[in-house]
């Protein structure tokens, strides 16, 4: 392995060498602070576009809820309405992860892009990003069914006894391990789709190769730590707002419209969470992708050449996948 000590060529937010955890977090923070418009501003704009219609629809549907507890329809409209903002959050996250991967990719070379340039650079990749999300959902359902199917069927036929309960507990633990494994092996799908211009299926295969071997544990650890950090920050910000909203509804005598306000609060919480946390978590994934390509493919050499001589970023893989 090459000795990188003392090599600190830094045209942008990172030194062009293998990155430490501190390098990654510092670079993402620098990218967000140095380009608020294309990070948090774009996150706000995208979230508003996606969340406003779904939150409004959710509030309207939830407002149709009956408060007759003995009604067969009790809870139906409220549940549907309260869930609709989640769809808006999902759509926003699909677009945002792509936008932010592009912004971070340009920032690596010291290039500051605006909202318009980011849109131009990523809009053709949105169908592939959506396809990747669909494949992820299908895969999650398949894995869940494969692991929990037999234990649940046994519990349904034999009832809950010592054996079936133990089997269910073991199955749930196995499911958690499987999710963490797949979550790590598919960590770079979004970055690969946006930066390398690959399709959804090819991006999954590429991410699988880049996360193989010993780097798996490092990637898992960094992503897990990042998830804890952003979740904590989101809860610290969102929870007081949610509690204030609930108590405000009760104080104003709006219990009859609790489901409608729940949908609205869900949309507001999703908006705040997206603006505050998504730029950081998406930026970490993008930089981990760059880091793995530096370690495995010598991408730093190509990035140095591009930084010194100009030209488009060398994101499409210049070496044979391995």
Please give the residue ranges for each predicted region.
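Hydrophobic, well-ordered secondary-structure segments
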Residues: 127-128, 167, 171-174, 187, ...
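Juxtamembrane transition segments at transmembrane-helix termini in multipass membrane proteins
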Residues: 1, 182-198, 222-322
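Helix-coil boundary and N-terminal low-complexity module in membrane systems
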Residues: 1-140, 204-206, 283-322
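Nonpolar helix-loop interface/hinge motif
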Residues: 6-58, 62, 178-258
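Hydrophobic alpha-helical membrane-embedded segments
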Residues: 90-98, 176-185
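Generic low-polarity alpha-helical segments
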Residues: 130, 156-162, 210, 219-220
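Membrane-helix interface segments in multi-pass membrane proteins
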Residues: 50-89, 144-176, 234-277
